[in-house]
Regions:
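Residue-level marker of regulatory loop/turn positions in helix-turn-helix DNA-binding domains and
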Residues: 4, 43, 129
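Hydrophobic (often cysteine-bearing) scaffold residues that line and stabilize catalytic clefts
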Residues: 4, 47, 51, 91, ...
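Soluble "head" domains of membrane/secretory-pathway proteins
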Residues: 8, 13-36, 58-59, 63-64, ...
Length: 254
């Protein structure tokens, strides 16, 4: 708006509504607000990434199920969440379903997955399931010192001399899965694992030399206990360890 001093015949144009330097101050104010907003977003995202990494490292981690060796409890391409407090603060138990790193070339040569940088970052942070196919998932049947054998006259697995009835074995399979009989003692610091799909699981039975030494999985290779199926949503469910199966099994004797 133009303003004039009629006594001196001088007019001036005030485009800022009467506030000198208003446009420049507005721009500086907006730039300051934008910088503050960006800084807050960076802080929030950084804290979220750190928190995700801490959760993945110490508490929970998602994994992808690459095969049908645990059917029908788990099926191929399920996504599960694994609790990292087992083993550790929460002790391993017979019947636990555990994810572990390949203990001795059980998987052979695994091709390297081709991922985008974003996919790799999400897996590293624990925001996407590990699909590297370098891990296995099986059920713990024997703890350190346990004597595990298969099969008795009724075709059942025995642990420390007690036959167990396993409702989680895939319908149509036998507890032995048609594999040769065995009788082993689980070495210290290891566990004996078997898949629920007994006829289609390359587990401890397939990698042992008859002593339990080679087929048993070192506990320090275990990443954690599978807790829940989270994907697909139609299969959302808890993964339980049926303690009643092993309730009458005595502790291992020295």
């Amino acid at each position: 708006m133009a303003q004039c001093d009629w006594s001196s015949d001088v007019c001036s144009s005030d485009l800022s509504g009467g506030t000198p330097g208003g446009t420049g101050e507005t721009r500086r104010s907006f730039a300051g607000w934008l910088l503050s907003a960006v800084r807050e977003v960076v802080i929030v995202v950084s804290l979220a990434m750190v928190l995700s990494l801490v959760v993945k490292t110490f508490l929970l981690q998602p994994f992808h199920i690459p095969s049908g060796s645990m059917e029908d409890t788990l099926i191929k391409d399920d996504r599960v969440v694994v609790g990292k407090l087992t083993p550790g603060p929460i002790a391993l138990q017979r019947g636990d379903v555990v994810v572990f790193a390949d203990p001795g070339n059980w998987l052979g040569d695994v091709p390297v997955k081709q991922r985008t940088p974003l996919q790799s970052l999400l897996i590293f942070l624990g925001l996407a399931p590990d699909d590297s196919d370098e891990h296995l998932i099986k059920r713990v049947i024997g703890l350190p010192g346990d004597k595990v054998a298969c099969c008795d006259v009724q075709g059942r697995v025995t642990v420390n001399g007690v036959a167990i009835v396993e409702p989680y074995v895939k319908p149509g399979d036998t507890p032995g899965g048609g594999r040769p009989d065995f009788s082993i003692v689980v070495p210290a610091g290891k566990v004996w694992v078997m898949g629920d799909h007994r006829s289609d699981s390359a587990d401890s039975r397939m990698h042992d030399d008859g002593t339990g030494a080679l087929g048993s999985v070192p506990i320090d290779k275990i990443h954690g206990r599978a807790l829940v199926v989270v994907w697909p949503l139609s299969r959302l469910s808890w993964i339980t360890a049926p303690q009643s199966v092993f309730g009458s099994v005595p502790a291992a004797t020295p």
